[in-house]
């Protein structure tokens, strides 16, 4: 009886560990996707001015401990952004081949160089331009803004 109980416990432990191994990668990818959304996606705005950058950088928690020097907000529907992941693979800045490019409306926010966290100040530049994003998963989702 004790031997049978031990086998059942070992089997449950094995299944639990196996399950954790399968869940972790998708959880990590989901975290990276959520971070990408928080840092780079603002579909309802047109952006384009310094006040927008100052507010959004603070609101999206990129000025808490230090002033993030540069960030880009994409002003497109998330499905339009995700569709970039279905374009041909190109090489990322880090050498990996999981990047894709597309043309989108953006606001680039550049730190002025004279501010200190949490009161960071930014200069805005709105444009429609080519962007490169890294995508991962199945289906692929954006996880990193490359350039």
Swiss-Prot record:
InterPro entries: RNaseA, RNaseA-like_dom_sf, RNaseA_AS, RNaseA_domain
Cystine residue pairs: 53-109, 67-120, 85-135, 92-99
Any GO MF annotation of the entry: endonuclease activity
Catalytic activity, EC: 3.1.27.-
The UniProt record lists the keyword Hydrolase: yes
Domain of life: Eukaryota
A biological process from GO: defense response to Gram-positive bacterium
Signal peptide start-end: 1-28
Positions of the catalytic residues: 40, 144
Role, per record: Cleaves preferentially after uridine bases. Has antimicrobial activity against uropathogenic E.coli (UPEC). Probably contributes to urinary tract sterility.
Family per record: Belongs to the pancreatic ribonuclease family.
Name this polypeptide is given: Ribonuclease 4
Protein encoded by which gene: RNASE4
């Amino acid at each position: 009886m004790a031997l049978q109980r031990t086998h059942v416990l070992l089997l449950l432990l094995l299944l639990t560990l196996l399950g954790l191994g399968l869940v972790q990668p998708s959880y990590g990818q989901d975290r990276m996707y959520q971070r990408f959304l928080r840092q780079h996606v603002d579909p309802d705005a047109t952006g384009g001015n310094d006040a927008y950058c100052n507010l959004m950088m603070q609101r999206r928690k990129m000025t808490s401990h230090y002033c993030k020097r540069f960030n880009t907000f994409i002003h497109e529907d998330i499905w339009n952004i995700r569709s970039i992941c279905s374009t041909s693979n190109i090489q990322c800045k880090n050498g990996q081949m999981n990047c894709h490019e597309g043309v989108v409306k953006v606001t680039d926010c550049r730190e002025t160089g004279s501010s200190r966290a949490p009161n960071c100040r930014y200069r805005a530049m709105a444009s429609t331009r080519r962007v490169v994003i890294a995508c991962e998963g199945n289906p692929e989702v954006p996880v990193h803004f490359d350039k």
